[in-house]
């Protein structure tokens, strides 16, 4: 496939290519990376690093998402939630999706390596491989703990953002990593619980299918309590202040409450409500981190 053909296809089917990028997920990824950038310095992150770092990390995340679509095509075709995606419907071919994923990935590496720094480029590449290939192709079909074992790649964005600005790794960046890492299982298992009948038709051994509803709910509650504790670490380590602490307690308390309600009253509606709140929770928690970091400077 020539470059001209790819460009023409992208212009014609741009909505389908956008779906391949999983824009909602990538938006959250990019936001947490941006928070990592700004928390890494006392003042504002340099505009050049902010611009190209955000672009490069976003393109890398979109590339991994497109690879995920490629590998998940057969499973997507039998699930109501994903049957309308570009590959199962034939709106895009596998060749188009692969060329798109490669183009995004190469663009990400070039931007990050030459316009940001090599460390961020290599870490982003590792994250792309971790999510797009290791998790999707190997862990996801192999074990019910796939989301736990593969969660590291999805938790990397704040580390990438931090490295983009400072050119180094820092323990505070890994506190942000740990929050997302522990957040991922209850977030995903709430969705899997609501869609357990659909997942039972795929090759993937999702926890509600292999271990049952009650065990899955128990794990969701346990991980959410663990997340509540982990979310306090930025305050305990003096990385963040009282404003963040109040936000973390309020947001975490609501998350714990929803999971307990779900544990006592199983329903797909409650599972989806918990899943939806988990997204709001993570975005709001990182917003509190950002506001807490800068608000004292304006008071």
Swiss-Prot record:
Membrane topology designation: Multi-pass membrane protein
Compartments reported by the entry: Cell inner membrane
Enzyme class: transferase
Family the UniProt entry places it in: Belongs to the UbiA prenyltransferase family. Protoheme IX farnesyltransferase subfamily.
Any single Gene Ontology cellular-component annotation: plasma membrane
Main location: membrane
Keywords: Cell inner membrane, Cell membrane, Heme biosynthesis, Membrane, Transferase, Transmembrane, Transmembrane helix
Species assigned in the record: Nitrosococcus oceani (strain ATCC 19707 / BCRC 17464 / JCM 30415 / NCIMB 11848 / C-107)
InterPro entries per the UniProt record, alphabetical: Protohaem_IX_farnesylTrfase, UbiA_prenyltransferase, UbiA_sf
Listed GO MF terms: protoheme IX farnesyltransferase activity
Catalytic activity, EC: 2.5.1.141
Catalytic activity: heme b + (2E,6E)-farnesyl diphosphate + H2O = Fe(II)-heme o + diphosphate
Recorded superkingdom: Bacteria
Record's function text: Converts heme B (protoheme IX) to heme O by substitution of the vinyl group on carbon 2 of heme B porphyrin ring with a hydroxyethyl farnesyl side group.
Transmembrane segments: 25-45, 51-71, 97-117, 119-139, 147-167, 173-193, 225-245, 275-295
Record-linked CDD domains: PT_UbiA_Cox10
GO biological process, one term: heme O biosynthetic process
Name the UniProt record assigns to this protein: Protoheme IX farnesyltransferase
Pathway(s) where this gene product acts: Porphyrin-containing compound metabolism; heme O biosynthesis; heme O from protoheme: step 1/1
Pfam family, one: UbiA
Keyword Cell inner membrane: yes
Gene from which this protein is expressed: cyoE
Misc. remarks from the entry: Carbon 2 of the heme B porphyrin ring is defined according to the Fischer nomenclature.
């Amino acid at each position: 496939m020539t470059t001209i053909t790819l460009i023409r296809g992208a212009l014609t089917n741009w909505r389908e290519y956008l779906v391949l990028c999983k824009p909602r997920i990538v938006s959250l990824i990019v936001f947490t990376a941006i928070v990592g950038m700004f928390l890494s310095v006392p003042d504002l992150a340099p505009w050049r690093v902010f611009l190209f770092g955000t672009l490069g990390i976003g393109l890398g995340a979109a590339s991994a998402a497109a690879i995920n679509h490629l590998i998940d095509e057969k499973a997507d075709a039998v699930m109501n939630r994903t049957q309308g995606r570009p590959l199962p419907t034939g709106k895009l071919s596998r060749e188009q999706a692969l060329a798109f994923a490669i183009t995004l990935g190469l663009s990400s590496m070039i931007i990050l390596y030459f316009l940001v720094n090599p460390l961020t480029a290599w870490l982003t590449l590792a994250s792309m491989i971790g999510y797009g290939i290791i998790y999707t192709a190997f862990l996801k079909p192999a074990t019910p703990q796939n989301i736990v074992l593969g969660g590291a790649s999805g938790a990397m964005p704040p580390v990438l953002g931090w490295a983009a600005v400072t050119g180094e790794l820092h323990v505070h960046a890994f506190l942000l990593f740990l929050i997302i890492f522990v957040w991922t299982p209850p977030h995903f298992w709430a969705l899997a619980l609501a869609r357990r009948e659909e997942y039972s038709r795929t090759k993937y051994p999702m926890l509600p299918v292999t271990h049952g509803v009650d065990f899955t709910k128990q794990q969701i509650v346990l991980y959410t309590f663990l997340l509540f504790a982990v979310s306090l670490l930025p305050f305990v380590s003096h990385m963040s202040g009282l404003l963040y602490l109040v936000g973390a307690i309020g947001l975490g308390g609501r998350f714990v409450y929803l999971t307990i309600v779900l544990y006592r009253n199983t329903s797909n509606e409650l599972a989806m409500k918990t899943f939806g709140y988990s997204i709001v929770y993570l975005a709001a928690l990182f917003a509190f981190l950002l506001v807490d970091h800068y608000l004292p400077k304006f008071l």
